[in-house]
Design a protein with these regions (language model features):
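Extracellular/periplasmic ligand-binding modules, especially the Venus flytrap/periplasmic-binding
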Residues: 313, 359-362, 408-468
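Extracytoplasmic ligand/sensor domains, especially the bilobed periplasmic-binding protein
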Residues: 224-327, 377-401
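Beta-alpha junction/loop-to-helix N-cap segments that form part of ligand/metal-binding clefts
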Residues: 152-154, 169-176, 190-262, 333-338, ...
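Solvent-exposed, acidic/polar segments of extracytosolic/periplasmic ligand-binding ectodomains
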Residues: 470-515
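C-terminal capping alpha-helices of c-type cytochrome domains
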Residues: 15-21, 98-113, 120-148
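Gly/Gly-Pro-rich "capping" loops immediately C-terminal to redox-active cysteine motifs
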Residues: 38-100, 121-127
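Electrostatic cytochrome c docking/interface patches
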Residues: 12-49, 92
Length: 515
């Protein structure tokens, strides 16, 4: 399965005190004093508070201006105002570049640098010197917020996919499916008249090359507005940092390696639960259905700080719901004596084992346990369940449980047929369905978020739109819900039993939510 996280875009540094005050003035009309300065409107000079007529109302939160009601407010980002060759407006009004003094006169007296009167729709604001300085500082900052990859007629969406090597078939299938999906959206008029365009960066086995390839996609030409279904196996944490630093939203399937740093994933919206969340689902199952005490459960975790944090998260989850703490054992590939580990766990009275991390194959662990004639309940998050899980020693029959973030039963019949038709349109006859289903659902979520962000598209509006999504039905996955702190849409999973005799999975009960 293609697993991913991430994003990118120009850096949006934290606001300075002056920029923050300028933003408040620009968006709300409230000055440095905490009150609204006065504004005069129209030929009669009607006096109103600036809070009734903030700059953003006409020029937009991004400063670019949008035609409305027969009036076309200009782009007032500072780099536009100071263009050395000046400006020629639609009504043929001409003037040279603004400077600080010219800006003051335009805002307060309604005159451009050539002495021409501005449109009467433009209020004349009675701002003090500090308010003017703060406003000018924020207009400079708007350049940093400008959304790359967005034009009047297009939005460029990036992805990172393997196009060569053993994963090439999966990567090419995702690319073909996304291109076909975007073509459908565009044929229906796009999003607020903008066409969706896919920009593909090539994932390489080498992390440095992959990051470099992604950087070119983000920075070359128009760049990209957001990332969709990126493949980031092996360097998720680094790409998550890139996403946050560049202030760009990302819609990703599922993260394999957890990132336990506070607010690390502020811009990454995962569709499905990963290994840590699914381990919590299994922990609940062990306690509620298998009726085990916390002390009966042992977490066998892979080595590494990410898995230390994951084990702490699962332990804390168990402790909130019951008495005592589960056991924890560290597995180091090539160093740990599994037979000795199994013997000690049995001697300690462990009745259930939750595997946490991809270093330890469940079949290898089960073989070591069987050599000790020990058959505990074996609980495996889906991302860590190898194909050999069906071939465990017979003593484990009825004792192996796997948690998955979604099942085929989540698929609405009509949506599934529509999805299959899209694959046919794209010429995809062999496909890793789990990967493509997640990418298709991600594209549906992306389009919904773009619609919610509105015509004045910005990364900030996109993130806010995603955070407000509640119970979104893609038709192929469990409902997706986000908020200001939640970055996993379908937070929970299904538990399935492994029938070793018949070599099949048997779902046990409904979706298990972690809300």
């Amino acid at each position: 399965m293609l697993l991913g996280v991430l994003a990118a875009g120009p850096s949006a540094a934290a606001l300075s005190a002056e920029e923050a005050a300028g933003r408040r003035l620009y968006e709300t009309g409230i000055g440095v004093s905490g009150e609204a300065p006065q504004a005069r409107v129209g030929s009669g000079g009607l006096a109103l508070p600036a809070s009734a007529l903030p700059c953003a109302n006409c020029h937009g939160r991004d400063g670019r201006g949008r035609p409305e009601g027969g009036v076309t407010p200009p782009d007032i980002r500072w780099s536009e105002l100071i263009k050395p060759y000046g400006h020629v407006h639609e009504n043929r009004r001409r003037h040279g570049p603004f400077d600080a003094d010219g800006f003051r006169i335009a805002v307060g007296d309604g005159l451009d640098p050539a002495g021409n009167r501005l449109d009467q729709a433009m209020p004349r604001y009675l701002f003090g010197a500090r308010d003017l300085d703060n406003l000018r500082a924020y207009l400079r900052h708007l350049e940093k917020r400008a959304a790359r990859g967005v034009g009047d007629m297009h939005v460029q969406i990036g992805t990172l996919l393997p196009l060569r090597g053993p994963l090439a078939d999966a990567g090419k299938a995702v690319r073909g499916m996304l291109e076909a999906y975007f073509a459908r959206v565009n044929a229906a008029g796009g999003i607020y008249g903008r066409r969706l365009e896919l920009v593909v960066a090539e994932y390489a086995n080498d992390a440095e090359r992959s990051v470099d390839n992604l950087g070119h996609a983000l920075d070359d030409g128009d760049g990209v507005f957001a990332l969709l279904s990126p493949f980031a196996a092996g360097f998720e944490r680094r790409l998550t940092d890139l996403a946050k630093a560049r202030d760009l939203p990302v819609v990703a399937p599922v993260v394999l390696v957890p990132d336990n740093r506070p607010a690390a994933n502020s811009h990454v919206f995962h569709l499905l639960s990963g290994g840590t969340e699914l381990a919590r689902v299994l922990a609940d199952y062990a306690r509620a259905t298998l009726e085990l005490d916390n002390r009966d459960i042992v977490l066998v975790q892979s080595a590494g700080s990410a898995w230390d944090g994951a084990a702490q998260d699962v332990s804390a989850h168990l402790e909130r719901g019951g008495d005592g703490s589960p056991g924890r054992t560290l597995f180091r590939r090539g160093l740990t004596d599994l037979d000795g580990m199994a013997a000690k766990l049995e001697a300690d009275g462990a009745k259930a084992v939750i595997l946490l991390g991809g270093d330890l194959d469940p079949a290898v662990f089960a073989a070591a346990a069987a050599r000790n004639d020990w058959y505990p309940e074996l609980l495996v998050p889906g991302p860590f369940a190898s194909q050999d899980v069906m071939a465990l020693p017979p003593g484990f029959d009825g004792k192996v449980f796997v948690a998955y973030p979604s099942l085929p039963t989540d698929r609405d019949k009509a949506t599934w047929q529509d999805y299959l038709a899209l694959l046919a349109e794209a010429g995809i006859d062999r496909a890793p369905h789990a990967t493509l289903v997640a990418s298709y659902a991600g594209a549906e979520l992306l389009v919904e978020a773009l619609k919610r962000a509105g015509r004045e598209l910005s990364r900030e509006a996109m993130v806010l739109g995603l955070e407000k999504i509640q119970g979104f039905e893609s038709g192929l996955l469990p409902p997706l819900t986000y908020n200001t702190t939640r970055r996993v849409g379908a937070l929970g999973g299904y538990v399935v039993a492994v029938d070793l005799a018949k070599r099949v999975y048997r779902p046990i009960g409904p979706w298990r939510s972690l809300d």
